[in-house]
Amino acid sequence: MRLLTILALCCVAIWVVESIGIEVLHETICVSLRTQRIPIQKIKTYTIKEGAMRAVIFVTKRGLRICADPDAGWTKAAITTLDKKNKKNKQKFNTTTVIPTQVPVSTNETTTVYG
């Protein structure tokens, strides 16, 4: 009975540790900041990370996460360009197109309805 209890506690402990580990892995931590400019065509999106090390995390179209200095000129220019691009795309999807339909031309005939 003791062995079964110990085994159950070990399984619960492993499950808890693994679930905590998964959450930590999803968080991006910047250890260093890239100084070399990234071509804007390769950047898909970005997030701003506040904390011990401030950083802008660019996500490339291939899914790579690159940490950059938020005060660098090229970083600010990339953010501005991405914001304009996203705003333009958002406006494109939010607009509705109205297509005029043809209204039949009435004739001088009179229709009588009985009922």
UniProtKB/Swiss-Prot annotation:
One of its GO terms (molecular function) is CCR chemokine receptor binding. Pfam families: IL8. One of its GO terms (biological process) is antimicrobial humoral immune response mediated by antimicrobial peptide. Disulfide bonds join C30-C67. GO terms for cellular component: extracellular space. The keyword Thylakoid does not apply. Gene3D superfamilies: 2.40.50.40. InterPro entries: Chemokine_b/g/d (IPR039809), Chemokine_IL8-like_dom (IPR001811), Chemokine_XCL1/XCL2 (IPR008105), Interleukin_8-like_sf (IPR036048). It is found in: Secreted. Residues 1-19 form the signal peptide. The keyword Metal-binding does not apply. Chemoattractant for CD4-dendritic cells, but not for CD4+ dendritic cells, T-cells or B-cells. This is Viral Lymphotactin.
